[in-house]
Amino acid sequence: MVELEKNEKINRLIALTKSDSGISGPELAKAHMKLGRLLAESSFMELDPDDTTVVAIMRGGIFFAEGIYFALSCKFMMYNPKTDDWKRPETKNVILADSVINTGRTIAGIFDDETKIASCVINEKAVPLY
């Protein structure tokens, strides 16, 4: 698991994405996309874009995943745990992207040793799962 180095810009974006920020709509989506891009630029640029898929965990992960996708120019797919059966992408590198990981149950069911996890917020109780 990787973490962005916190600075004023990162802290401001994270604050915008929290449920108590009062921010919604395009401004919230853009904050998630910027955080995704910044995480990708700091942690995933060494990955081969032709052999990498970012998976947006629906619905909360869509804009965060798009930020990663645009930064990496890799493959993209969406996964809705409520309606979809999980099929791991055939690429070597898979990044599971969700804006918030609460219990970790959704990702625990699809996570493997080759998978990377990207999230804006991970509940400390879920961290030991990964």
Q: Which residue stretches match the model-derived regions?
A:
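PRPP-associated nucleotide enzymes
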Residues: 1-130
